[in-house]
Amino acid sequence: MKKYLLGIGLILALIACKQNVSSLDEKNSVSVDLPGEMKVLVSKEKDKDGKYSLMATVDKLELKGTSDKSNGSGTLEGEKSDKSKAKLTISEDLSKTTFEIFKEDGKTLVSKKVNSKDKSSIEEKFNAKGELSEKTILRANGTRLEYTEIKSDGTGKAKEVLKDFALEGTLAADKTTLKVTEGTVVLSKHIPNSGEITVELNDSNSTQATKKTGKWDSNTSTLTISVNSKKTKNIVFTKEDTITVQKYDSAGTNLEGNAVEIKTLDELKNALK
C-alpha cells in the first residue's frame, strides 16, 4: 500500500512539474515587465530539471521556455500556424529583448526586433533569401532612421524622421548620407555606424562673392555658413535631434538674437539661402 501511495505521489509530482511548463497563471507564476511593452510569466517553483518555466505572448503567439534564473531572463520559443518559428531572447539584466521570426527551417530569418530599456529599438526585415531588406532604428527620443530597398551590397534608401519633418538620402558603405538642396547649395548630413554625425555644405555657385562655404565643428555639432569669408549663420544639430539656426551680425563677428528651432523642411531650406 505504501509503495502504491508513493507511486501515486511521484506521478502527481511529475504532473505538477509539467504543469509549470504547460500552463502558468497568476497563482503559480510572477509577471515581469520587459522592454517593448512585453511581459513574461516566471514560475514560482523550479521544474523537475531544476529550471524555472517561462511563458510570454507576443503578437498573439504563445512562447515557452525555461531558465536557470528566476528574474525572467532566458529564451522562449513558439511556432506559428504557417510553421514559421518564433524566438524571444531576454537578456540577463532584463534591459533588452530580441524577438526573431524564422522560416520553417528555423534558420532563415524573416524579421527581427530588438527592444531596449530606454525605449529605443532596432527592427529588421529580411527577403526570401534571408538577406536584410529593411531596417528601422528608433531612438529613445522618438526620432528614427528608416532604411528600405537594402541590397546585398549594403546600399539602399535612407530617411531620418525628426520630430517635425524628415530628411532623405542613401545608405552606402555603412554610412547614411542625408541631403537637402536649395538652389546651388547642398547640405549633407553623414551618420556612420558609430552614430557621430558630420555635416558639410557644398555650393556650386561660380561667383566667389556670393558663394557659400560651411565649416563643421564636431565639438558643438555646429555648421557655420560663410559668404565671401564672412560668417552669416550657425546651424546646430542638437543631441536631441533637433536643428536650430542663428544669424550673425552684418560684420559677421557676433551672433544676433537667439537660436530658433527649425520645424519644417522649408525652414531648413530657407536657412541655406
Swiss-Prot record:
InterPro entries listed in its UniProt record: OM_lipoprot_Borrelia, OM_lipoprot_dom_sf
Membrane association type: Lipid-anchor
Residues of the signal peptide: 1-16
SUPFAM superfamilies xrefs: Outer surface protein
Broad class of where this protein is predominantly found: membrane
Superkingdom to which the source organism belongs: Bacteria
GO cellular component: cell outer membrane; cell surface
Keyword Lipoprotein: yes
Keyword terms: Cell outer membrane, Lipoprotein, Membrane, Palmitate, Plasmid, Signal
Compartment(s) where it occurs, according to its Swiss-Prot or TrEMBL record: Cell outer membrane; Cell surface
Family label: Belongs to the OspA lipoprotein family.
The protein, known as: Outer surface protein A
Species in which this protein is naturally found: Borreliella burgdorferi (Lyme disease spirochete)
Taxonomy of the source species: Bacteria, Pseudomonadati, Spirochaetota, Spirochaetia, Spirochaetales
Gene: ospA
